[in-house]
Amino acid sequence: MQQLLVALTLVACVTDASAQDTTIGAGKVEIGGFPMGGTFFVGGDDNKEVDFNVYSAGANATYYFTDRAALEGEFSISFGLAQDVFFNRSEVLHIQMPNVWTYFANLVFFPAGSAGKRMPFYVTGGIGAVSLQSRQPTRQFGYDVDSVGFESFIAENIGGGVKIFRASAPDWGFRADYRYVIVNANGDAPAFFAKAKGRSGHRVSFGVLFTWKR
């Protein structure tokens, strides 16, 4: 009987340890990156203010205050690949765009909580900056590498998404995210983007995440 009790106790301990090892859902500190994304800037006038798209990639770190609330810092670079745009009321074919850098601090809220959830969904909003980087092909748009370099704008974002965790690899997960980016006007910027009026953009991204600390 004693041997049976000892065996059952050992099984219970192993089961409990295994359950703890396979805890899914968000932890306390999380790092991640999104190698796949796109940002679509809208609100131009097809004259001096140009609509354009960029390929986005970035990284983020998240600290969870509670099961429902977290603070996130994120950084991204978006590459202005060649595309067709309208500028000065005429179409410009296959021209590269400025690269776009973004920096945001966001508050993240999980309405249903995040701990122990396989697919916790969230809403988020934050403030930061958007910077356009001049390149040789963007000289005609006023973004001359010799005179402008970088031009920065105060910006906000709101959005939401979902994180996906699996029991087989509980510390790793995936993330799908959407942000509506609001770029404030900067009167010192070239007319190409957000000089006389604010602009906006839609960013969609897909990434991976790792729970650094539970």
Where are the model-predicted features located?
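Extracellular loop and loop/strand-boundary signature of outer-membrane beta-barrel proteins
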Residues: 43-48, 88-96, 141-149, 190-196
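Cleavable N-terminal export/targeting peptides
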Residues: 1-25, 213-214
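Residues that define the transmembrane beta-barrel architecture of outer-membrane proteins
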Residues: 27, 51-57, 97-103, 119, ...
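Gram-negative (and chloroplast) outer-membrane scaffold detector with strong preference
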Residues: 20-21, 32-35, 60-142, 153-154, ...
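Short glycine/proline- and aromatic-enriched beta-strand/turn motifs that initiate or cap beta-hairpins
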Residues: 19-64, 205-214
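Predominantly the C-terminal beta-signal and adjacent terminal strand-loop region
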Residues: 80-85, 164-214
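Outer-membrane beta-barrel proteins
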Residues: 40-47, 80-86, 132-136, 183-189
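Generic short beta-strand segments
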Residues: 36-39, 77-78, 179-181
